[in-house]
Amino acid sequence: MRVGMGYDVHKLVEGRDLILGGVKVPHTLGLLGHSDADVLLHAIMDALLGAAALGDIGKHFPDTDPAYEGISSLKLLEHVRDLIAKKGYVIENIDATVIAQKPKLRPYIEQMEQNVADTLQIAKEQVNIKATTEEWLGFTGREEGIASQAICSLTGLYEASMQVGGGCSGCGGCQAD
């Protein structure tokens, strides 16, 4: 089993949509970035890439490349999924936290989880997303930006096939002996 951790921060600005977990969240401010600046998906991608020892999103999707300008981070997550699979890993689980003073994210969490699960082709039960504030402290508390942290676990295909109970919780394509 391999574990990865991801962290990302983006500044809140006027004139941009707030996209978190592939969901357009109603808010007066949005996140500044080269892509759609989806801080949640960026943290998840970094966790996945880290667990597979594949670097980080800056390596794969540099902000100097015009091909990624304004791109949906869900598209980038698809590419990360393919890199993970090509290296022989399946995703066991993802746990992520969004840190934002505003807006309240509870109404959007379930759709965020579904978007991540659908894009990664895993069960929704393998994805957990939480939201919290920093009680008006720091840059997130002052509503200057939003941060996200994520952790994931991956299992190699062979290791997963040897697990008791029918293999890993990934694609469902293999079964334990």
Curated annotation (Swiss-Prot):
4-CDP-2-C-methyl-D-erythritol 2-phosphate binds at residues 8-10, 34-35, 56-58, 61-65, 132-135, 139, 142. GO terms for molecular function: 2-C-methyl-D-erythritol 2,4-cyclodiphosphate synthase activity; metal ion binding. Binds 1 divalent metal cation per subunit. Pathway: Isoprenoid biosynthesis; isopentenyl diphosphate biosynthesis via DXP pathway; isopentenyl diphosphate from 1-deoxy-D-xylulose 5-phosphate: step 4/6. A divalent metal cation binds at residues 8, 10, 42. The record marks 34, 133 as: Transition state stabilizer. GO terms for biological process: isopentenyl diphosphate biosynthetic process, methylerythritol 4-phosphate pathway; terpenoid biosynthetic process. Gene3D superfamilies: 2-C-methyl-D-erythritol 2,4-cyclodiphosphate synthase (3.30.1330.50). Disulfide bonds: none annotated. Its EC number is 4.6.1.12. Its cofactor is a divalent metal cation. Homotrimer. Involved in the biosynthesis of isopentenyl diphosphate (IPP) and dimethylallyl diphosphate (DMAPP), two major building blocks of isoprenoid compounds. Catalyzes the conversion of 4-diphosphocytidyl-2-C-methyl-D-erythritol 2-phosphate (CDP-ME2P) to 2-C-methyl-D-erythritol 2,4-cyclodiphosphate (ME-CPP) with a corresponding release of cytidine 5-monophosphate (CMP). This is 2-C-methyl-D-erythritol 2,4-cyclodiphosphate synthase. It comes from Agathobacter rectalis (strain ATCC 33656 / DSM 3377 / JCM 17463 / KCTC 5835 / VPI 0990).
